[in-house]
A protein has these predicted regions:
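Flexible, membrane-associating and regulatory peripheral segments of lipid-active enzymes
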Residues: 1-133, 142, 411
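Glycine-rich His-Gly loop
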Residues: 121-126, 200-201, 229, 316
Length: 411
């Protein structure tokens, strides 16, 4: 099916390849399940990300720093002679794909966006780790303002099971309710037409369970991005669930601060807790156990594949020296299974390989919070290193839009 694309790639006819693939997708989206097409999709997204990140002066400065515990600038007497593309790729990508910067691909062929909205589905603990702990908090409004691409956020509850959050997704998709790109409540909601769904962490299984249970929404979903999504569950969630599953948590108001402080000492404040009567700590962690998530994938992968939605997954990878000190134990524990974990998930857990229409786009060099959240408040950074979260999230968000647009999926 993808042989014409392979011939175009061998000739270096990148514009012809992009145009031909767009035509093929228009005829039959299942072409995105072809292994050769998946290779191109990953390569193209990484190229778009690298190109956009080179426009980010902060990202280039971070990419030029010597690797170490303390973020220091490169001394002027030791200039970095690598190209901007090489610096970005080697700092923010992992694995063999860091060599993608070698090939110069054409700029994105992005159509005008008229009827497509990006909907961000947040993860567990959203807004609870600190007052700024929202995925793409600063980047989403900047991208919307710069390019005119609409972005809203579903008000998924930060601490209850996946199925329970379906009503929150309905509120966003059917009524346009939730938050705007800058995390301000939407006061005059308008239901979106076509949507790009971006699920971060637990937000990804929230979205997947919703789509499996409500396939009638598939025609409105042009693509779904799983951003460090806990699709296969989490060993960390397994351990926490085993500890709390028999606790009497009848009063979320009384126990919430105590439980959250175990996850991130001294971070949560009472004023950050919303929708207290809806908290279900046990249900939240149970839905993230490897048993629950793998059972879901075994049962529902055929359903998800039949929806015809292109699924894209992106994972993170870090090392023990690059995580906050209170996440070190979990990172070391996960290293027994996968040295390239993101401090909360293994690579296999962040992928969606049981769904043929799913493509893994990239392994990013950053821990689970770095690739989504802005820097933690200064007082928290004084207590632990590796909370500055320098990953170029704006470039990643732009590349998601550009890939989807170039494939002819947006309207």
């Amino acid at each position: 099916m993808a042989l014409p694309l392979l011939e175009l790639e061998e000739r270096g006819d990148w514009e012809g390849l992009i145009s031909r693939l767009r035509d093929m997708v228009a005829d039959d989206r299942t072409v995105l399940g072809d292994p050769l097409v998946k290779q191109w999709l990953g390569r193209r997204w990484r190229n778009l990300f690298i190109a956009e990140a080179t426009r980010d002066e902060k990202a280039l400065e971070v990419a030029s720093r010597p690797v170490g515990l303390v973020p220091v600038k490169r001394p002027p007497l030791l200039p970095d002679h690598k190209s901007p593309q090489q610096r970005i790729a080697e700092r923010f990508l992992k694995g063999d794909t860091v060599t993608d910067w070698h090939t110069e691909l054409p700029p994105p062929d992005m159509p005008e966006v008229r009827n497509t909205t990006m909907v961000i589905a947040p993860g567990l603990l959203t807004g609870l780790l600190n007052e700024f702990a929202y995925a793409f908090l600063h980047e989403a409004p900047v991208v919307q303002e710069e390019f005119g691409w609409p972005i809203i956020r579903s008000d998924l509850h930060p601490f209850r099971g996946c199925d329970a959050n379906h009503d929150d997704l309905v509120a966003t998709l059917d009524r346009g309710e939730g938050f705007d790109a800058a995390m301000q409540p939407i006061t005059d909601p308008t239901p979106p037409d076509k949507v790009i769904l971006v699920g971060y962490s637990k937000g990804a299984p929230d979205v997947l369970t919703f789509l499996a249970a409500n396939p009638e929404y598939a025609d409105r979903v042009v693509a779904m991005f799983s951003w460090a999504g806990a699709n296969g569950g989490s060993y960390t969630a397994d351990n926490i669930y085993a500890t709390i599953k028999d606790l009497d948590i009848s009063s979320a108001t009384e126990r919430m601060r105590e439980l959250l402080s175990l996850l991130n000492p001294g971070v949560v404040t009472d004023g950050m807790l919303r929708r207290l009567d809806e908290y279900d700590v046990v249900g939240a962690f149970e839905s993230l156990t490897t048993e629950a998530r793998l059972a879901f994938l075994r049962r529902e992968s055929p359903t998800l594949n039949a929806l015809g939605i292109p699924f894209f997954t992106v994972s993170g990878a870090t090392s023990p020296l690059e995580v906050p000190n209170f996440q070190l134990a979990d990172t070391l524990s996960l290293q027994k299974y996968d040295a390239n974990n993101d401090m909360q998930l293994l690579q296999s857990q962040a992928r969606l390989d049981t769904v043929e229409m799913s493509t893994h786009l990239a392994v990013l060099h950053g821990h689970h919070w770095d690739i989504a959240y802005p820097p933690f408040p200064r007082q928290m950074q004084l207590l632990s290193p590796n909370l500055d979260n320098p990953f170029p999230k704006r470039a990643a968000l732009v590349a998601m839009w550009q890939l989807t647009g170039e494939l002819g999926l947006v309207e």
